[in-house]
Amino acid sequence: YWISQVFDSLWPLSKELQHPNLSYKYIDVGSGCGFPGLAVAIAMPNANITLLDSSNKKTTFLKEVSKEIGLKTRIEVITERAEVTGHHHSFRQNFDYAMARAVAPAAVVAEYLIPFLNSTGQGLIFKGKWTNQEQKELRKALIKLNAKLKESQKFDLPDNRGIRNVIRIESIGECPKKYPRTVGTPRKKPLSN
């Protein structure tokens, strides 16, 4: 469990973890049971984390966990779709890091993440398998979002637990205001088409 959840949530942030006292703002899109967001909140004591999920059941759980582990002052839990939250003034272009793990194909996730990033922010897409075709589709979507692929890193989890990839993306200018598109559209009509 610890390898597949906690370690898997933190290894992509190994650079950031070298400076755990910096006050970065993170948003975990499609947070589910709280990974990677909760792990980041614990590992980075000055970080502010927003956990975003559309399921009320999941966000109720996340609020309770945040309270129980004593981090409710640094963790904000939002029950809403990324396509909606990405247009709110208080969230749009307001984060140093926007992350998503096991949410959707990378080209779809990019449309969720890029609108949240500030001018120097980075999006982190956590993936298992990562193919050249997915990279090509992501690059196509990023052009429309006024963003670029910064790097991709591959990692073998300990104890033969599998291969993981993290794809770092970043804005190269302001994301067009029409993104993210309305609820469901990014998945039905990916920008890579």
Regions from the language model: what does each represent?
Residues 2, 10-102, 110:
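Conserved SAM/SAH cofactor-binding pocket of Class I
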Residues 48, 74-76, 122, 148-151:
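Conserved beta-strand segments of alpha/beta enzyme cores
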Residues 58-60, 131, 135:
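Short alpha-helix immediately C-terminal to the canonical SAM-binding loop
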Residues 71, 117-119:
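Helix-to-beta-strand junctions that scaffold the AdoMet/dcAdoMet cofactor pocket
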Residues 83, 128-132, 157:
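Short "lid" loop at the C-terminus of a central beta-strand within the Rossmann-like core
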Residues 102-103, 173:
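Short glycine-/small-residue-rich Rossmann-like dinucleotide-binding loops
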Residues 120-130:
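Conserved beta-strand signature within the Rossmann-like core of class I S-adenosyl-L-methionine
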Residues 136-193:
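SAM/dcSAM-binding transferase cores
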